[in-house]
Curated annotation (Swiss-Prot):
Name of the molecule in the record: Signal recognition particle 54 kDa protein
Subunit structure: Part of the signal recognition particle protein translocation system, which is composed of SRP and FtsY. Archaeal SRP consists of a 7S RNA molecule of 300 nucleotides and two protein subunits: SRP54 and SRP19.
The encoding gene: srp54
Source organism: Methanosphaera stadtmanae (strain ATCC 43021 / DSM 3091 / JCM 11832 / MCB-3)
Annotated binding of GTP, by residue: 106-113, 187-191, 245-248
Reactions catalysed according to its record: GTP + H2O = GDP + phosphate + H(+)
Assigned EC number: 3.6.5.4
GO cellular component terms given for this protein: signal recognition particle
Amino acid sequence: MLEGLSESLTQTMKKLAGMSIIDKKTLKDVTKDIQRALIQSDVNVKVVFGLTKKIEKRALEEELPKGLSPKEHVMRIVYQELVNLIGEKPEELKINRKPYKIMMLGLQGSGKTTTTAKLVKHLKKKGHTSAIVCTDTWRPAAYEQLRQLTEPLDVPVFGDPENKDAIDLAKKGLEKCGSKYDVILVDTAGRHKEEKDLLDEMAELSQIVQPDEVILVIDGTIGQQARSQAETFKKTTDIGSIIVSKLDGSAKGGGALSAVAEIRAPIKFIGTGERVDDFEAFDPERFISRLLGMGDLDTLIEKAAEVTSEKSDKEMIDSIISGKFTLKDMENQLEMMNKMGPIQQIMKLIPGLGNQLPANASKVTEEKLGMYKILMNSMTTYELENPEVIKKSRINRISRGAGLTNDDVKDLLKYYNVTKKALKGMGKRNMSGPMGKLMRHMQR
């Protein structure tokens, strides 16, 4: 998620942590690095310079807080101002009536339909029953896409691909849903902001649906253009909140987030990948903590809680955090990571690990995961608990037993060693020094 921006800001914080003195010159060096990183992420130039001016002013004029050194104080200011840049923490989506009606809006290509399915999954995790009313008459595949995405969730989709009257579809869909479901999501046709007829239809739909919440889905790859998009929709209907989609790997995601924050539209959720599970409630403090390489243990614990139930799973989470795990632990880890999301994203939640995990460590496809499981099934319990004993003769035996090659065994061992090495620095060492002190200070 925002890999380039995260890497740049993490390096800036490390540079700051390593400074022996903080004066106007060193402060200017730091703010120039921040300016470069944010502008490359398509954050508005005027906004960027305003932010770095605040950082410099506060760093030079504020009284040093008790218990913090000058550089720790500057790091704290950088963190706080970046949090302010992307807005306040929004209120949670409160389902306070039945049915609670949500109208989903967005431009064509924003990822609105997929995001609707993601929101349904999120609501299901919270214990709410949902149904979807599809009123998208412009894209023939919309109804079928929704049906396929939500079928595993056992969520009904009401619609009719043959009916080209969105208002009629909304009325009939709402009538069929009645009050059987906690939440009814109305998926609308993707708009172009210039298409007046569609915007008029959206306003009419809003009158028919009488939504409790109107959610606008904005594509995170469009950068600061998100501002004008949100403003156009806001003029047509009341926007209750915003979901920024496609933040995984987007070079302009920072620009999109800050642009939306400028017009004070609350960002409630963000989409962080292609899977239905790649979706999370937006929390500016947690988000910036991850961007700066400070981790986000709260989100890690929440994600783990969603996919773990047995004691052994919880013990394995401790292994991940401590960096002490065997091949058997790694087998369980990969299973859990596969449920929680891409390993690179999960590792960014662990304080101090941030960008340390090599890029190739995240490229564990389902196919490779299957191969690794076959290889581990060919190992003895002793080998799984003591991977260091696996040398040439054992490699030969394991590969033969699995029907795979020696290179496959070596690939597994290489992945294990890379991951173990990356996790070795976890624990107390990652919470030491200025960065660690700042993390502890932020957790108070």
